[in-house]
Amino acid sequence: MANSANTNTVPKLYRSVIEDVINDVRDIFLDDGVDEQVLMELKTLWENKLMQSRAVDGFHSEEQQLLLQVQQQHQPQQQQHHHHHHHQQAQPQQTVPQQAQTQQVLIPASQQATAPQVIVPDSKLIQHMNASSITSAAATAATLALPAGVTPVQQILTNSGQLLQVVRAANGAQYIFQPQQSVVLQQQVIPQMQPGGVQAPVIQQVLAPLPGGISPQTGVIIQPQQILFTGNKTQVIPTTVAAPTPAQAQIPAAGQQQPQAQPAQQQAPLVLQVDGTGDTSSEEDEDEEEDYDDDEEEDKEKDGAEDGQVEEEPLNSEDDVSDEEGQELFDTENVVVCQYDKIHRSKNKWKFHLKDGIMNLNGRDYIFSKAIGDAEW
């Protein structure tokens, strides 16, 4: 059921591509022992994905709707001028160049989400068109996905050499036919600004009919522009400009505002760091760390006091040195202050090799450069 439903909704162009791919890989799948049901499920899944992408939404619905409206409007004229139209059928090569005109169809803004292209013949050439010509013209149409906010302009080329332009606008819900003008429409779209350089596509459409009344297809030129963020300023620098014709007039779209391009040398572009936090810490962070360490020490002291543990005094403290010993040291006679080279000990005997010192012996001071002495203790 899903396959039959998708067959009616998916256009013939896309369905033919899907069928060709399935037929090409059918033998390979069968050689590998894969059931043919898998191919059918793959085809169904492919068509479902195509419909979910909305790439072909309204492809046939708009076509049928426009055909019915044009036929209803010109049905009385066909009955009154049957003889005149029969004469046109006898000489189609003379009438087609004169009647081939590019027309525009305005579609309401509620349908601006997608931009499919529709094949619609001229109102005076309805009787010359058949189902096969419409199908072949639909096979040559392409879908151009435009960014959000851009009014899609669609160009359709029929078998008779007519270029039909379908425009979606927000000024009404009626389909309005307008003749084509030889102008160049330039429309610039700047997406939401993000850090770093982004590309803003500029869609330029050239509408210029060729001599003889036959109009070519629309040329769509993508002009990328580089947007640089420098502090609080935004610079738009155009990179390349492509011209489809040697001489053409460029008319900016209504309401378009282009920021003034400033030289990049005035201010260095701001480089954003995206690989983590900064390399240096602020003074506030350091103060917070110190306060956190102090709080931890206070908590430890409180916990020790609550547990009733008495802190032991560390080793190598100066508690064993009293002031009285210092007084006794200076009151002692026979004091030597010097440097030493060697000190030898044999059991309780010590031998000193002294140098560059002063000694006080029996109340007298002596200065020496070298001295040797023995002692026991």
From Swiss-Prot:
Residues 281-330 have a biased composition (Acidic residues). GO terms for biological process: positive regulation of transcription by RNA polymerase II; positive regulation of transcription initiation by RNA polymerase II; transcription by RNA polymerase II; transcription initiation at RNA polymerase II promoter. InterPro entries: TFIIA_asu/bsu, TFIIA_b-brl. The keyword Iron-sulfur does not apply. The keyword Repressor does not apply. The modification Phosphoserine is found at S281, S282, S317, S322. Residues 69-79, 89-105, 248-280 have a biased composition (Low complexity). Transmembrane segments: none annotated. The alpha and beta subunits are postranslationally produced from the precursor formby TASP1. The cleavage promotes proteasomal degradation. The record marks D275, G276 as: Cleavage. SMART domains: TFIIA. Residues 69-107, 248-330 are annotated as: Disordered. Pfam families: TFIIA. The modification N-acetylalanine is found at A2. It is found in: Nucleus. PANTHER family: TRANSCRIPTION INITIATION FACTOR IIA SUBUNIT 1. TFIIA is a component of the transcription machinery of RNA polymerase II and plays an important role in transcriptional activation. TFIIA in a complex with TBP mediates transcriptional activity. This is Transcription initiation factor IIA subunit 1. The lineage of its organism: Eukaryota, Metazoa, Chordata, Craniata, Vertebrata.
